[in-house]
């Protein structure tokens, strides 16, 4: 089965990539491999890979200054903005456990999570200062950053890196614990796709609190030296498609349906340079695959218990096997 995925990728590009077992080592890799390429952008500010990793290292400096015990649970409640993207990397790179929180949580839910997971603290975006005013843990602005860089923590692939909340598949939400090796294996699995995979353009449509969005929609894109645009509002993110002209989108079937309906109304020009949609986290209707083909877009379908396995399989032969997930 490994050959199915390896054989679909440009072999020259595949030679430049390798499985990296921890987030600190991954940061060193992308800094060296893609230094001057653009990494993340909110359409106003764009950071290269060199700048991104430098800023992550400065955030590690701030985290280290807090004097927390290594392996502490640290949450982030923020929009899908540049700060959240940096904190997603900085917290595990500092040797702590990242918990990305869904934006819809109310004050009671946040208080309960703080106590249940023994949070050492929470980085909070400006939009969430009111709802976090009484949480029983320390809070820091999501903009917090040090003035100088610090070395990344020395962690192993089995060191806990993050906790993601499950959806409805397994009943009541619970925390799925992921090691560095788990996060990075999923991120490496996410690089595979048909044809050229390096230096593409994406919009981070799915929240970083959703592991499919975090792994497939962000980490795997860093792995390939691609440019990822922030998406702090889903409606605005969809409207950005003809503006930033992503080549690839990582979506769930519900979002694919919305985008297809808009394209039917406005025409193919709305989709810009879009050529590939990676779709998962729920069953993908064969009808959507057929409609994407009509717009000249390949829709690759995947499905797995994403909170627990983060990236399990994908179907890049939807024309031949539309019902298959392999």
Residue ranges and their predicted role:
Residues 88, 99, 103-132, 147, ...:
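Conserved ATP-dependent adenylate/AMP-binding module captured primarily in the ANL superfamily
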Residues 147-165, 172, 195-201:
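Conserved pre-ATP/AMP-binding loop-to-beta segment of ANL
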Residues 48-50, 161-185:
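Conserved AMP-binding A3 loop
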Residues 184-201, 208-273:
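Conserved AMP-binding/adenylation subdomain of ANL enzymes
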Residues 247-251, 259-322:
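Gly/Ser/Thr-rich phosphate-binding loop
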Residues 1-47, 51-66, 70:
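N-lobe entry segment of adenylate-forming
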Residues 19, 45, 60-105:
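Conserved AMP-binding/adenylate-forming
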Residues 12-21, 141-160:
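Flexible, low-complexity linker/hinge segments
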